[in-house]
Design a protein with these regions (language model features):
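Residues at or immediately preceding the N-termini of alpha-helices
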Residues: 7, 26, 44, 228, ...
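N-terminal Rossmann-like NAD(P)+-binding subdomain of aldehyde/semialdehyde dehydrogenases
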Residues: 1-102
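Rossmann-like NAD(P) dinucleotide-binding subdomain of oxidoreductase/dehydrogenase enzymes
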Residues: 91-230, 354
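ALDH superfamily catalytic-core signature
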Residues: 161, 194-334, 357, 397, ...
Length: 446
């Protein structure tokens, strides 16, 4: 059977069994989630090895990041699913008193899930949790740029699910294009804005709803008087995690001009402690760039910025043989340089000086609405002004990633950084059709 034929056959099977899944209660959905959890637990070492093979992720990196993120989503859904599935009463307006109004949550149907390469385990399986919890079926394509992890994800899905409920398809762009020929009820995509546009255009042919988790230039903004040691340490952690190949990474940092030098010194000291021993970069501590194309892209950003007057205060070395870009810090970067117009997605941190907050908010607004924003300030007026004059998918104040890590907060982007929300209850709602129901007279008898 050809890949195209299998796609058509599985799609037809899942569509034909939609009513069966819709009739199933919380117990059946919870059983599927438990099967997924068991399949993950039995392959922890294989997941770790795959992440190292694909990205040179540090030993135990998966156990400290991607794996608990997925397991946490599963456990939360198992514990809350009965409550989430319950019809939600809606107050009846005065005009319609005596009638019954409520919202029923029904599955969207057959969902296409397209995973990403940068966190290839979590971004293939974390969205699958609300898909299953909401009673949908899914056809999952892990990302081909992380082939070892794609293989393990496929093994997990095949072990946990019947193909009529969740099926997996490995392969390259041609597989993604073949999948998108089918009229899915919903499409869930994580990746770049450029590819997101193509996914949305393909979905539009069938009027499929979409969830797009994209990215953008996520800024860190440090206020005057804020603890530089605290801010610098957290910015470094958020910029160089996974070698900057993270949609939530700090893309660049705005710092008051009076303290930019000490800020950069602290950043340098933190980087030395995190990634170096006796002045030598420890490759096992820094993931590699995913491929040569992305290596060349990020190196090109550095070269173009330096050619236009930017100054390297740390790093700058690039080893194409190992796909390693040393943690790099730039200052005096022109705002119209490519590195300031495009999402970096690599281990490079431009540090920008400012004297007037208006300058910062105007530039953030000019770059589009990012997926995340990080504000470091002890002044409520400063925080309020930034929030008023900018927009982003989410924001964390005086820390990094926390709005993503809190499972009860909806996570997602806005406009160029994405659309739709997931995590926890928000994910269940996103992957459900909220069906408005009105019963004349308030009751229906058999």
């Amino acid at each position: 059977m050809t890949q195209d034929s299998r796609i058509e056959q599985v799609f037809a099977l899942q569509r034909a069994t939609r009513t069966v899944r819709k009739s199933e209660g919380a117990r059946t959905r919870i059983a599927r989630l438990k099967d997924l959890r068991d399949a993950i637990h039995s392959r922890i070492d294989a997941i770790e090895a795959a992440l190292h093979a694909d990205l040179r992720r540090a030993p135990n990196g998966g156990k400290e990041g991607e794996i608990p993120a997925v397991l946490g989503e599963i456990d939360l859904a198992i514990g809350q699913l009965e409550q989430w599935m319950a019809p939600q009463p809606v107050p009846t307006s005065e005009r319609f008193q005596g009638n019954q109004t409520f919202i029923q949550y029904e599955p969207r149907g057959v969902v296409l899930l397209l995973g990403a390469w940068n966190f290839p385990f979590a971004l293939a399986l974390s969205p699958l949790v609300p898909i299953v919890a909401a009673g949908n079926s899914a056809m999952v394509k892990p990302n081909e740029l992380s082939p070892a992890t794609s293989k393990v994800v496929a093994e997990i899905i095949q072990a946990a699910f019947d193909e009529q409920d969740v099926a997996v398809f490995e392969g390259g762009v041609e597989v993604a294009e073949a999948l998108q020929q089918q009229p899915f009820d919903h499409v869930f995509f994580t990746g770049s804005p450029n590819v997101g546009k193509m996914v949305m255009a393909a979905a539009a042919r069938h009027l499929s709803s979409v969830t797009l988790e994209l990215g953008g230039k996520c800024p860190a903004i440090v206020a005057s008087g804020y603890d530089l040691v605290d801010a610098a340490g957290k910015v470094v952690g958020a910029r160089f995690n996974n070698a900057g190949q993270l949609c939530l990474s700090v893309d660049h940092a705005w710092v008051p001009s009076a303290v930019i030098e000490p800020f950069c010194q602290i950043v340098g000291a933190v980087i030395e402690k995190m990634f170096f021993v006796d002045g030598q970069l420890q490759l096992e501590r820094l993931p590699r760039m995913i491929n040569e194309r992305n290596f060349d892209r990020v190196k090109g950003y550095i070269d173009e910025a330096v050619a236009r007057g930017a100054r390297i205060v740390l790093g700058g070395q690039c080893d194409r043989e190992t796909l390693t870009i040393y943690p790099t810090v730039l200052v005096d970067v022109p705002l119209d340089a490519r590195i300031m117009r495009e999402e970096i997605f690599g281990p490079v941190l431009p540090v920008l000086a400012y004297d007037d907050l208006e300058q910062v908010t105007e530039q953030v607004d000019a770059n589009g609405k990012p997926l995340a924003m990080y504000i470091f300030s002890d002044q409520q007026a400063f925080i309020d002004e930034v929030l008023l004059k900018t927009s982003s998918g989410g924001v964390t104040v005086n820390h990094v990633f926390m709005h993503y890590l809190e499972p009860n907060l909806p996570f997602g982007g806005v406009n160029g950084s994405g659309m739709g929300r997931y995590h926890g209850h928000a994910g269940f709602i996103e992957l459900s059709n909220s069906r408005s129901t009105f019963i004349q007279g308030g009751t229906v008898t058999n």
